[in-house]
Amino acid sequence: MRGPKKHLKRLAAPSHWMLDKLGGVFAVRPNPGPHKLRESLPLSLFLRNRLKYALNYTEAKKILTQRVVRVDGKVRTCHKFPTGFMDVVAIERTNEYFRMLYDTKGRYVVHRIQAAEADFKLCKVKSVRTVNKGVPVLTTTDGRTIRYPDPHVKVNDTIVFNISTQKITDSVKFEPGNLAYVTGGRNVGRVGIIGHRERLPGASDIIHIKDSAGHSFATRISNVFVIGKGNKALVSLPTGAGIRLSIAEERDKRMAQKH
């Protein structure tokens, strides 16, 4: 039996990390944590490649050892810690707050938020079950286990989780008419209103979604993350508000910026 893999070649790293092919042989391999390797971004890459606060890997590690970076309210000093969708990254020394969100090309964007919005995060409910002595337990997609949740919260619903008190303050049902963010598949990063649910026996359910520009698309239920009641989002959205432009629309936008 072989042990765990400890290295990651740059060519095998997720494409959304946007690493230079000629920048070296290896990439940072994220530690096991709340997010999967292919769906996460290590803290060192966030500081160096996204924020440009460090010129190299060593500088990023030195910033983290000063205990000034918090992820979801907890100080993180490991440069391999995997940050992922909806995580709140706070840098105390500069009083900056960021939420990890996808753009419409599936890449993590540096989305700055206000201090008031940094107090909470949204978590998708992965399972609801009972454990020893009949205690109800809820698990979320970011690895949290919460005891004695609201009995009305079901699988695929979204909870509003207060980071400072570690309590559920609100919940949003997974139902038609609510606003959702797509977190995987070819439509990753798109935002729209949930339409009808297509149930397929023996296969994953298909959810039909329509964005604010009137474009309709469909994706698997596992890729749908509810972020608001009706058409009002509970969190601020990055530039573009999750609307994917066609190739022609992107070209026209670039031409307009040049003139």
UniProtKB/Swiss-Prot annotation:
Task: Name all S4 RNA-binding domain ranges.
Answer: 41-100
> Pfam families per the record?
40S_S4_C, Ribosomal_S4e, RS4NT
Q: GO terms for molecular function, please?
A: RNA binding; rRNA binding; structural constituent of ribosome
Q: Which UniProt keywords apply?
A: Ribonucleoprotein, Ribosomal protein, RNA-binding, rRNA-binding
Domain of life, per UniProt, equals Eukaryota
Q: What are its GO biological-process terms?
A: translation
Query: Per the record's keyword annotation, is Ribosomal protein included, yes or no?
Result: yes
What are the record's GO terms for cellular component? cytosolic small ribosomal subunit
Keyword Flavoprotein in record: no
- Which InterPro entries does its entry note? Rib_uL2_dom2, Ribosomal_eS4, Ribosomal_eS4_C, Ribosomal_eS4_central_region, Ribosomal_eS4_central_sf, Ribosomal_eS4_KOW, Ribosomal_eS4_N, Ribosomal_eS4_N_CS
Provide the family line.
Belongs to the eukaryotic ribosomal protein eS4 family.
**What NCBIfam families does the record point to?**
PRK04313.1
Q: What is this protein called?
A: Small ribosomal subunit protein eS4
Which species does this protein come from? Caenorhabditis elegans
Q: What is the lineage of its organism?
A: Eukaryota, Metazoa, Ecdysozoa, Nematoda, Chromadorea
